[in-house]
Amino acid sequence: MKGKFLKVSSLFVATLTTATLVSSPAANALSSKAMDNHPQQSQSSKQQTPKIQKGGNLKPLEQREHANVILPNNDRHQITDTTNGHYAPVTYIQVEAPTGTFIASGVVVGKDTLLTNKHVVDATHGDPHALKAFPSAINQDNYPNGGFTAEQITKYSGEGDLAIVKFSPNEQNKHIGEVVKPATMSNNAETQVNQNITVTGYPGDKPVATMWESKGKITYLKGEAMQYDLSTTGGNSGSPVFNEKNEVIGIHWGGVPNEFNGAVFINENVRNFLKQNIEDIHFANDDQPNNPDNPDNPNNPDNPNNPDNPNNPNNPDNPDNGDNNNSDNPDAA
């Protein structure tokens, strides 16, 4: 696969694909096909203020053979009030790799966790400390919520280009999900084709560390695959895809020129993976009384009022149950 060359100014940068790292003046190969879902743990959890790389040595990360997918619908506009509402957890990422410093995007979804792409974390070459995150970044001179250094990486066990990154607290002992409110995830029960969406992140064709939002519609949806008609470029890798309720419905990975951009859709399989690995991740319906995952739902097996819960005093399998039919009860006949 031949690399595409991109002109670089002091503020704009080159690109990384699944098979090709594109920079000026030469292209270097980098593969991100590994599907290892075992966590990569750093040797130390000590947090220091991350060094911020500026200027033209930055290279946006992108997926598949292309990521600079500017479609006829090129409704991109800059977000300057980055600390407000659902924009606050959108995060600027730098990866300090042996071959250079790369930029990407992500979204905070837990007290100490962020979602991005597998091909973004692959650029760390197994060293989580190489990945730095700057939530709500305004520009390369203004990081209102500071920076955080990764300590553990967990890749999605399925085919989707998705990864979880866990961070150490900062020097003030604050976690990344404490300086910003984590994003709310959609249960995606009502997500369908033709719905309005936005992709928000840090594209590499714009001034460094500036947040941009693209607007469009879903054009395809099946399994973990979601496609849409809005425009993105390298650096948008890992950007959250929001629905009209400002809930995260997917994580952007890249696209195909003149055709579509795409994301990992948060379907049931992805949702289960996230819940298994992020204890405090919040989905929009978690608090609903009929949600089986809600601990207050009497049908939740962990609810002590559930008659099937062995800790329920009325459960005949509970040794504290006074039912004489329970042979484990010392008061049983």
UniProtKB/Swiss-Prot annotation:
In the UniProt record, does the keyword Ribonucleoprotein occur? no
Propiece residues: 30-68
Post-translational modification as stated in the protein's UniProt record:
Proteolytically cleaved by aureolysin (aur). This cleavage leads to the activation of SspA.
Q: Where in the cell is it found?
A: Secreted
sequence repeat feature ranges: 289-291, 292-294, 295-297, 298-300, 301-303, 304-306, 307-309, 310-312, 313-315, 316-318, 319-321
One GO MF term on file is: serine-type endopeptidase activity
Please name the catalytic residues of this protein.
Answer: 119, 161, 237
Region annotation Disordered: residue ranges? 33-61, 283-333
List site positions: Cleavage: 68-69
Concerning InterPro entries, the annotation shows:
Glutamyl_endopeptidase (IPR050966), Peptidase_S1_PA (IPR009003), Peptidase_S1_PA_chymotrypsin (IPR043504), Peptidase_S1B (IPR008256), Peptidase_S1B_tx (IPR008353), V8_his_AS (IPR028301), V8_ser_AS (IPR000126)
Q: Which N-terminal stretch is annotated as signal sequence?
A: 1-29
What GO biological process terms does the UniProt entry carry, in alphabetical order?
Answer: proteolysis
Query: Which terms in the GO cellular component ontology are assigned?
Result: extracellular region
Identify the EC number(s). Answer: 3.4.21.19
This protein's source sits in the domain of life called Bacteria
Answer whether the UniProt record assigns the keyword Hydrolase to this protein.
yes
Q: Which reaction does it catalyse?
A: Preferential cleavage: Glu-|-Xaa, Asp-|-Xaa
Q: Where is this region: 11 X 3 AA repeats of P-[DN]-N?
A: 289-321
Give the compositionally biased regions (Low complexity). Answer: 40-54, 286-333
Q: List the Gene3D superfamilies.
A: Trypsin-like serine proteases (2.40.10.10)
Keyword terms of this UniProt record: Hydrolase, Protease, Repeat, Secreted, Serine protease, Signal, Virulence, Zymogen
Q: What is its biological role?
A: Preferentially cleaves peptide bonds on the carboxyl-terminal side of aspartate and glutamate. Along with other extracellular proteases it is involved in colonization and infection of human tissues. Required for proteolytic maturation of thiol protease SspB and inactivation of SspC, an inhibitor of SspB. It is the most important protease for degradation of fibronectin-binding protein (FnBP) and surface protein A, which are involved in adherence to host cells. May also protect bacteria against host defense mechanism by cleaving the immunoglobulin classes IgG, IgA and IgM.
- Other remarks in the entry: The cascade of activation of extracellular proteases proceeds from the metalloprotease aureolysin (aur), through SspA to SspB.
Similarity section: Belongs to the peptidase S1B family.
**Record protein name field:** Glutamyl endopeptidase
